[in-house]
Regions:
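Short loop/turn elements that form and flank the Walker-type P-loop nucleotide-binding site
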Residues: 16-17, 56-57, 105
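ATP-dependent small-molecule kinase phosphotransfer cores
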Residues: 1-53
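Conserved phosphate-donor/acceptor-positioning beta-strand/loop module used by diverse small-molecule
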Residues: 23-25, 54-75
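Active-site-adjacent beta-strand anchor residues
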Residues: 1, 64-65, 115
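NTP-dependent small-molecule kinase module
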Residues: 69-136
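Arginine/glycine-rich "motif VI" loop of SF2 helicases in the C-terminal RecA-like domain
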Residues: 51-55, 101-102
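Residue-level recognition of specific faces of alpha-helices
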Residues: 44-47, 60, 91
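Short glycine-rich anion-binding loops that position phosphate/pyrophosphate groups of nucleotides
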Residues: 27-29, 33, 67-69, 117
């Protein structure tokens, strides 16, 4: 429901105004968490996506690989938690593998190892974004 509202109230209006839209999670997160993590039927999820997206597709997707150890450290540092933060480690492993599986077969997806130092990772990501947006 919240993803539908986000698409309807934020993404679609911005795209109509020819704005660049950046989301930190989108449809692949639903597939990774619901289908591969929680075993929800993929056809069910795909049908929902067709209805709410109406052919909206990301031009560029950045996937950050993170080690199990690093993800646990990051979770411990958070001040607030959500329901996904308390799932078993196997859930996160399945989700991570599914993100990589989804990304490997698509030319507009880029996979980065998040163990790079922040500046190196940031530089690599911005280089791709600039290229995609034709910014020098």
């Amino acid at each position: 429901a919240s993803r539908n509202e986000h698409i309807k109230n934020k993404i679609k209006p911005a795209l109509k105004q020819k704005k660049v839209v950046i989301c930190d999670r989108f449809i692949d997160s639903t597939i990774a968490y619901q289908v591969y993590g929680k075993k929800v039927d993929i056809n069910f999820i795909n049908n929902i996506h067709k209805k709410i997206l109406q052919n909206i597709k990301p031009n560029l997707v950045i996937v950050l690989k993170v080690s199990t150890k690093s993800s646990r450290k990051r979770l411990k540092k958070r001040k607030t938690r959500n329901r996904y933060d308390n799932f078993a480690q196997s859930f996160y492993s399945k989700a991570q593998k599914s993100f990589i599986r989804i990304a490997k077969n698509k030319k507009n997806y880029f996979i980065f190892d998040s163990s790079y130092n922040d500046n190196t990772l940031e530089d690599k990501i911005f280089a791709i974004i600039k290229k995609r947006l034709n910014i020098k």
